[in-house]
Regions:
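Outer-membrane beta-barrel signature, preferentially recognizing the C-terminal barrel domain
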Residues: 403, 422, 432-481, 508-518, ...
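Face-selective signature of the C-terminal outer-membrane beta-barrel domain
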Residues: 218-246, 266-401, 405-410, 417-420, ...
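N-terminal periplasmic accessory domains that precede
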Residues: 29, 59-64, 78-81, 101, ...
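Short acidic/polar hinge/loop motifs at secondary-structure boundaries
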Residues: 94-122, 162
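Short, acidic, small-residue-rich periplasmic hinge/interaction motif at the N-terminus
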Residues: 20-52, 61, 76-77
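Transmembrane beta-strands of outer-membrane beta-barrel pores
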Residues: 149-153, 168, 179-183, 241-245, ...
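Extracytoplasmic beta-strand/coil segments of soluble accessory domains associated
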Residues: 60-96
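Outer membrane beta-barrel strand-and-loop segments of large Gram-negative receptors
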Residues: 324-326, 456, 460, 466, ...
Length: 680
C-alpha cells in the first residue's frame, strides 16, 4: 500500500531528473536483436557490432561508426558536437563524464553497450543536447600502453596522446598525457556593415582581413586511481592539470569607408592554467539500495592581453582567477514496481577578473546553486514512464547587483511500444538556463571604431519549456524515426543594441520576451549489407520565433545530410556530408556552412593507420557566416579558413595490452566547470 501511495503522488506531480542505472529494472523494452539496440524512454541502448568495435581505436572512432542522429564527429579535432547546435554533447564512460584522454585510451573491444540519450534531463546539467554514455567492462588484471595521434600534412595542426593503464585485482591506476597544437594562417574575415547614425544618415564600413595568424599550444596530464568491487563499492580520484597558450594571434584588416581607406591591427595573447580534483564514491547498501556521491574542485587561472589599433591604440589585459566546488549525492531504491531516486546537487563559485589599461575595473562574481530532485521510473498500463519533481535555486551577487531565482522543474517522459516495430514517445520538461558569466560582467570592451560589447550585471536566469513527440520504426536492417519539438524560452537572454548620442553602437544581453523554436526532423538508417555496408540519411525543417522588446525576427531553415560506412576486413571507409545549420537567435542570423568528411583506415594487429580529408575540392571554404538584423545596425560577416580547405590528416594509433581480463562496471556522475567569466 505504501508503494502505491508513493507512485500515485509522484505521477500526480510529474516533475525532473534523469535515469540512474536504467537497465537495472525490467521495463520490457522493445528489443530488435539484429538492429543491436533497445529503445528506452530517454533514447536508446546500442550494442555495437564486432565489426564496429574491431575497426575502432578509440571512443571517438567508435562513436563515429555508430552514425548517431543529430551528432557530428570530427576525429581530426577530437570533437563530438550537435549538428543543430542545440547544446553540448556530453560524453561519459560508465556514467562518469569522460575526458578526451580517457576516450582516446579506452578499449573499444571492452565496450558492452552505449546509452544514447536524446532527451537528457537536468540531472545531466544545463544546455546539454545529447548524452553518450559508453559502458565498458573493467579490467581485473593486466595493463594497456598506447599512443593515438592525428596530425595534418597540409597545415600545422595536430593532437597526440600517450596513455598507460594498469589493473591489479580491484585497483586501477592510469596516466595520460595529451599535446595539441595548431598554427592557422589561412583565416580571413570579411565584413560589410551599415550604420544608421543619429542624424538619420547611413555610414558604411567594409572590413577585410589581409593577413591573420592563429596559434595554440595545449598540454594536459591526468592521473587516476580507481578502487572498486563492482558488487559493493567504487572509489575513484582523478587529478588533472591543463595548460594552454595562444602566444600571438594577430591580424591585419583593410578598412574602407566612404571617405578613406586604412589598415587596422589586432593582437591577442592568452594563457590558461586549470587543475581539477575529482572524487567519486558509490556504495551498495543492500536491499536494492545504493548511494552515490561526487565532489569536484576546480581552479582556473587566465591571463589575457588584447590590443586593437584602428588609427588610435586601444588595449586591455585581464588577470582572472576562478574557484569552484561542485557536490552531488544520489540515493536510489530499486523497488519492485519502480526505481526511486532522490538527489541533491550544489555548487559554489567565486570569480575575480581584474581588467587593466583602457578597461579599468575588477569583477567580483559570487554564484551559488542548489538543486533537489526526486524521480520514479517504471511501467504502467503497458507504457514506460519517467516522472520527476525538483526545485532549483540560483543566487548571484556582484557589488549592489544580485538575484535569487527559484524554479519548480517538472519532467515527464512516456513511451509506448506497439505492433512490435513501432515506439511512440512524448516528453515534457521545464528547465532552468542562465547566460555565461561573462555576460554579467561590468566591463565594456571596444570591438572596432563603431561597436562595443557591454556586460549586463542585471541579467537573470530564465525558464525553458519543451514538448517533444517522436515515432520510431525498427526492423532488423532498417530503422527510421521522426521527432517533433516545440521549445519555449520565456523572459530569456536576448540581443540588445543601443545607439548612443555620439554614434556608438553598444551590444549587450538583456532579459526580453521569448525565443521559441519548432522543428520536425527524420533519420533513416539502412544496413545494405549487414556488418559490411550501411547508409544513414537525415533531414529536418526548423522554424524560429524571436520576440524582443523592440524587434520581431522569424526564420525557417532546412538541414539534411548523409553518412556512409563500409567495413572490408581490415579496411574501414567512411564518408559524411551535411548542408550546415542555420538559426536565428535574438538579432543574429547564424549559419555553419556545409561540411564533408572522408576517411579510410587500415588496421593490422596493434597498429592502425588512417587518412582523413576535410572539405575536399574546396580551397578556401566558408566555415560560418552571420547577419546582424538590428534596425540601426545591419552587418554581414563571412569567416573563411583555407587551412581547412582540402585538409588532409594522418592518424597513427598503437595499443599494446597484456593480461587484460574484464568485469562489468557502472558509475553515474558528472560535474565540471570551465566558465572563466571574462568578457572579450
Amino acid at each position: 500500500m505504501k508503494k502505491k501511495i508513493i507512485l500515485t503522488l509522484m505521477l500526480g506531480i510529474c516533475l525532473p531528473i534523469v535515469a540512474q542505472q536504467v537497465d537495472e529494472i525490467n521495463l520490457k523494452e522493445v528489443e530488435v536483436k539484429a538492429a543491436r539496440f533497445v529503445l528506452k524512454p530517454d533514447g536508446r541502448l546500442i550494442f555495437p557490432s564486432d565489426a564496429q568495435k574491431n575497426a575502432s581505436t578509440s571512443g571517438f572512432s567508435l562513436i563515429n561508426k555508430l552514425a548517431l542522429p543529430g551528432i557530428r564527429v570530427d576525429e581530426t579535432l577530437r570533437t563530438v558536437t550537435s549538428i543543430r547546435q542545440e547544446g553540448t554533447v556530453q560524453l561519459r564512460i560508465n556514467g562518469i563524464i569522460a575526458t578526451k584522454e580517457e576516450l582516446l585510451s579506452m578499449e573499444p573491444k571492452a565496450v558492452k553497450s552505449i546509452h544514447f540519450i536524446d532527451q537528457p534531463g537536468i540531472r545531466y546539467g544545463t544546455d546539454v543536447a545529447f548524452v553518450i554514455d559508453i559502458r565498458v567492462q573493467k579490467a581485473a588484471n593486466g595493463y594497456v600502453l598506447g599512443f593515438d595521434g592525428v596530425n595534418s600534412v597540409t597545415t600545422y595542426n595536430g593532437d597526440n596522446s600517450f596513455y598507460y593503464n594498469a589493473n591489479h585485482n580491484n585497483s586501477e591506476i592510469g596516466v595520460t598525457y595529451d599535446f595539441g597544437y595548431n598554427d592557422f594562417r589561412g583565416e580571413r574575415t570579411d565584413e560589410a556593415a551599415r550604420y544608421e547614425l543619429v542624424d538619420g544618415s547611413l555610414y558604411t564600413v567594409q572590413r577585410n582581413d589581409e593577413t591573420a595568424r592563429n596559434r595554440y599550444f595545449g598540454h594536459c596530464i591526468q592521473l587516476k586511481y580507481n578502487l572498486a568491487d563492482s558488487a559493493s563499492y567504487v572509489f575513484q580520484t582523478r587529478l588533472s592539470t591543463a595548460f594552454s597558450r595562444m602566444p600571438d594571434n594577430n591580424s591585419v584588416c583593410q578598412i574602407t569607408t566612404p571617405t578613406q581607406s586604412y589598415k587596422a591591427f589586432s593582437e591577442q595573447k592568452d594563457k590558461d592554467f586549470t587543475p581539477i580534483l575529482d572524487l567519486y564514491f558509490f556504495r551498495d547498501l543492500g536491499k536494492h539500495q545504493s548511494v552515490t556521491a561526487n565532489m569536484v574542485g576546480t581552479f582556473i587561472r587566465t591571463d589575457l592581453e588584447s590590443s586593437y589599433n584602428e588609427g588610435a591604440p586601444y588595449a586591455y589585459s585581464v588577470a582572472g582567477n576562478s574557484y569552484s566546488l561542485i557536490g552531488e549525492a544520489i540515493y536510489e531504491n530499486r523497488l519492485k514496481p519502480f526505481l526511486l531516486s532522490l538527489g541533491f546537487n550544489g555548487s559554489l563559485k567565486y570569480t575575480r577578473n581584474s581588467y587593466q589599461k583602457d578597461v579599468s575595473l575588477t569583477d567580483n562574481l559570487h554564484h551559488e546553486s542548489v538543486y533537489c530532485f526526486a524521480e520514479i521510473k517504471g511501467k504502467l498500463f503497458g507504457a514506460n514512464y519517467t516522472a520527476d519533481i525538483g526545485v532549483s535555486n540560483q543566487r548571484y551577487r556582484q557589488d549592489e547587483n544580485r538575484y535569487n531565482y527559484w524554479l519548480w522543474r517538472p519532467k515527464l517522459t512516456l513511451s509506448y511500444p506497439f505492433l512490435k516495430v513501432f515506439n511512440v514517445k512524448y516528453g515534457f520538461e521545464m528547465s532552468e538556463h542562465m547566460s555565461q558569466m561573462a555576460n554579467i560582467s561590468r566591463a565594456e570592451i571596444r570591438q572596432n571604431s563603431m561597436e562595443w560589447t557591454v556586460g549586463n550585471p542585471e541579467l537573470r536566469p530564465y525558464k525553458r519549456t519543451s514538448h517533444t513527440f517522436s515515432l520510431d520504426f525498427e526492423q532488423p536492417r532498417i530503422s527510421s524515426g521522426i521527432k517533433m519539438e516545440y521549445r519555449i524560452n520565456s523572459n530569456c537572454s536576448m540581443d540588445k543594441y543601443v545607439r548612443t548620442a555620439d554614434n556608438r553602437f553598444l551590444y549587450s544581453k538583456t532579459n526580453q520576451q521569448n525565443i521559441n523554436m519548432l522543428y520536425v526532423n527524420n533519420y533513416t538508417r539502412w544496413d545494405m549489407v549487414p556488418e559490411k555496408l550501411s547508409v544513414m540519411v537525415f533531414g529536418g525543417i526548423y522554424r524560429f520565433f524571436n520576440q524582443g522588446d523592440d524587434y520581431r525576427h522569424y526564420h525557417t531553415s532546412y538541414n539534411y545530410g548523409a553518412n556512409v560506412q563500409a567495413y572490408l576486413n581490415q579496411w574501414t571507409i567512411m564518408g559524411y556530408a551535411d548542408n550546415g545549420w542555420e538559426f536565428i537567435e535574438g538579432e543574429h542570423l547564424n549559419r555553419n556552412h556545409s561540411t564533408i568528411y572522408l576517411s579510410v583506415s587500415y588496421r593490422v594487429g596493434a597498429f592502425e593507420i588512417g587518412l582523413f580529408c576535410q572539405h575536399p575540392f574546396r580551397k578556401n571554404p566558408i566555415m560560418n557566416s552571420s547577419k546582424v538584423l538590428n534596425r540601426y545596425l545591419n552587418k554581414e560577416t563571412f569567416y573563411r579558413n583555407s587551412s581547412f580547405g582540402n585538409m588532409i590528416s594522418l592518424n597513427f594509433a598503437w595499443k599494446f595490452t597484456k593480461g587484460r581480463q574484464y568485469k562489468q562496471m557502472q558509475r553515474t556522475m558528472n560535474n565540471k566547470d570551465t566558465d572563466t567569466g571574462i568578457l572579450k
